[in-house]
Design a protein with these regions (language model features):
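Surface-exposed repetitive/solenoidal architectures
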Residues: 1-188
Length: 188
């Protein structure tokens, strides 16, 4: 980026999808992408799917991102699904951004689903539904380091503060990262 990009609340189609994921390098030069809406589909985010990509040095603010396919939708403030050695570095999602979906645990403030992905030096102040402050679902090969989330959760069950779900077969590493939020439990 050479400047902030303001979508003025217009709709945005996610960059990359399952058939043709984003595989390049995106360096935001510490600017912001602001005020966009992504709704619908299987992969909702600024980037829908990234594989072997390098995405770094920018923030998202004022966005509304919602995955709407009932059982398989992923949503993330930066990327919905990341894999194949993707690196997310020095990116953030600011307060005023809402990330949600129809499936619990499949959306996160930064990324909805990760496998073989490194996330380094990120933060999220997003409002999330039943997802994670940083990651919704962390599968094998996920590395999260030097990152934090400070979220507002709007759903029942509530979202969690860093990662909603970690694959129990192992292979996820979390170092020097934490999450805080507005509540720790939900009751009717």
């Amino acid at each position: 980026l050479r400047n902030d990009i303001d979508f003025a609340n217009a709709s945005h189609t996610s960059i990359g999808d399952h058939t043709t994921p984003f595989t390049g390098k995106f360096d935001g030069n510490f600017f912001q992408v602001k005020n966009f809406n992504v709704s619908g589909g299987y992969r909702a985010g600024l980037f829908g799917e990234a594989n072997g990509a390098r995405i770094e040095n920018f923030g998202v603010s004022g966005a509304t991102i919602t995955g709407t396919v009932a059982t398989t939708a992923y949503a993330g403030g930066i990327v919905a699904v990341s894999s194949g050695g993707t690196l997310l570095k020095n990116v953030y999602v600011a307060a005023g951004t809402t990330v949600g979906g129809t499936q619990n645990g499949r959306h996160g403030g930064i990324v909805g689903y990760t496998t073989n992905t490194t996330i380094d030096g990120v933060y999220s102040k997003a409002t999330v539904g039943s997802g994670g402050g940083i990651i919704g679902f962390a599968a094998t090969g996920t590395v999260l380091k030097d990152s934090y989330s400070d979220i507002v959760s709007t759903a029942s069950p509530p979202g969690t503060f860093a990662i909603y779900y970690i694959n129990p077969t192992g292979g996820t590493t979390v170092t020097n990262s934490y999450g805080i939020g507005d509540r720790f439990s939900y009751s009717n």
